Amino acid sequence: MPQLYIYIRLLGAYLFIISRVQGQNLDSMLHGTGMKSDSDQKKSENGVTLAPEDTLPFLKCYCSGHCPDDAINNTCITNGHCFAIIEEDDQGETTLASGCMKYEGSDFQCKDSPKAQLRRTIECCRTNLCNQYLQPTLPPVVIGPFFDGSIRWLVLLISMAVCIIAMIIFSSCFCYKHYCKSISSRRRYNRDLEQDEAFIPVGESLKDLIDQSQSSGSGSGLPLLVQRTIAKQIQMVRQVGKGRYGEVWMGKWRGEKVAVKVFFTTEEASWFRETEIYQTVLMRHENILGFIAADIKGTGSWTQLYLITDYHENGSLYDFLKCATLDTRALLKLAYSAACGLCHLHTEIYGTQGKPAIAHRDLKSKNILIKKNGSCCIADLGLAVKFNSDTNEVDVPLNTRVGTKRYMAPEVLDESLNKNHFQPYIMADIYSFGLIIWEMARRCITGGIVEEYQLPYYNMVPSDPSYEDMREVVCVKRLRPIVSNRWNSDECLRAVLKLMSECWAHNPASRLTALRIKKTLAKMVESQDVKI
């Protein structure tokens, strides 16, 4: 009977302990007392060692907001830590609380990190009522990287928007100002044009104006005011060519066709030089391209350099030979007229209104034009050199352009040409003229045979040869364009072959003069009864 009583007592104690353990809620970590039964606070009689927390001393802590049910006078008992905590809720209000913390997990809870969205701070201690004096403070507000980046992006976007708006306003003002200036210039131009129409009488042709200037003027071309008037009244029709200097247009002045050479602004030196040469006294010749006017047109934002000349619809000798063949009479007419033009350039005319000797320096088939009557005229004088015999001075143009490498004389290619004397420039022109005669002779039909058109040295150098390519062929190997065997069987071509060979001789002193070439061709023209 006593044993049964003991078993009942033990069973009751066990059930009491179980009920105490299961009755703890989730917040017992913070406000649980951690109290144990008397039997739990002692070692078992069998000598079994209890857990470490069973040996820790119990603390009395101050509690407020986290008091357990058995708290007395705002105090609680625990074997863990006393704590004080301050929290901020979703509305931004702060709450300060304190209480007891159980031993289990207390180290982790005391090192608790606040959440990113809700701030809180917890402080722990291990002496009686120590948390009564703890005053935890909330951590400072930290701006997250995303929020910080958003601010930067917002500032950047606003700055960009302001800059774009400012640029739009500036561009609009600039365009409006330019538009007003353009309208003003156009009105002024139209007003000047009306005045100019009255300046040149209606019915006057270009030939009439030029004849008048030749008979009553200085022989250097139309007066500048007339030139500017003509340039203003030109109507551009279509582009007919383009080169390294600019473009060539076919235009009309009072119904008459004219050629308008529009120079790039970078080629102002070439425009100035060519204008200067054309306006040289006594320069006009039937085998030199007829000069009409020169002018600079434009406003502050654009500039056009005009050179207005006679228009020849057959184009250049280069274009003509590619699509047409020649008989001996046509060949001699082309060669003789070109020689006449070159002779006029090279010849100095003495007198009070004399003409200086001029060397072309860029003679080639593309710079010789074909007139309606089948004769030639020499064009493109942008590189021309003048010689003043009174001062013995060689006037070389100050521009960056150079001649065409394919047509350069040996002394130009190997840089042995004496630039301080005028005669070497003349002899270099003669070499180039010999190559042009070769181009013509290839297209002359004899015995029903004719060669296709080719440029000089077509089979010896690339299509765009370098100085080294030409120097190797012309100076080192001393080669010249190939000649067909049929030329020797025709009297006319045989004479032309002899002439061109004397033109392209390696030694400049051995070459013919332009006057000698002209006289030789004149005899051939006369023997063939060619009408010039």
Curated annotation (Swiss-Prot):
Q: Which residues form the signal peptide?
A: 1-23
MF annotations from Gene Ontology: ATP binding; BMP binding; BMP receptor activity; metal ion binding; protein homodimerization activity; protein serine/threonine kinase activity; SMAD binding; transforming growth factor beta receptor activity, type I
UniProt domain Protein kinase: residue ranges: 234-525
User: Which subcellular locations apply to this protein?
Assistant: Cell membrane; Cell surface
TM helices/strands, residue ranges:
153-176
Residues at the catalytic site: D362 (proton acceptor)
Instruction: Return the SMART domains for the record.
Output: GS, S_TKc
Task: Please write the reaction equations for the catalytic activity of this protein.
Answer: L-threonyl-[receptor-protein] + ATP = O-phospho-L-threonyl-[receptor-protein] + ADP + H(+); L-seryl-[receptor-protein] + ATP = O-phospho-L-seryl-[receptor-protein] + ADP + H(+)
Q: How would you summarize where this protein is expressed among tissues?
A: Highly expressed in skeletal muscle.
Cytoplasmic compartment ranges equal 177-532
**Disulfide pairings:** C61-C82, C63-C67, C76-C100, C110-C124, C125-C130
**Keywords linked to the UniProt accession:** ATP-binding, Cell membrane, Disease variant, Disulfide bond, Glycoprotein, Kinase, Magnesium, Manganese, Membrane, Metal-binding, Nucleotide-binding, Receptor, Serine/threonine-protein kinase, Signal, Transferase, Transmembrane, Transmembrane helix
Q: What is the effect of changing M460T?
A: Found in a patient with tubular adenoma and rectal neuroendocrine tumor; uncertain significance
- What function does the entry list? On ligand binding, forms a receptor complex consisting of two type II and two type I transmembrane serine/threonine kinases. Type II receptors phosphorylate and activate type I receptors which autophosphorylate, then bind and activate SMAD transcriptional regulators. Receptor for BMP2, BMP4, GDF5 and GDF6. Positively regulates chondrocyte differentiation through GDF5 interaction. Mediates induction of adipogenesis by GDF6. May promote the expression of HAMP, potentially via its interaction with BMP2.
Family per similarity comment: Belongs to the protein kinase superfamily. TKL Ser/Thr protein kinase family. TGFB receptor subfamily.
The protein's name in its UniProt record: Bone morphogenetic protein receptor type-1A
- Organism annotation: Homo sapiens
Q: What is the phylogenetic placement of the source species in the record? A: Eukaryota, Metazoa, Chordata, Craniata, Vertebrata
Gene name, please?
A: BMPR1A
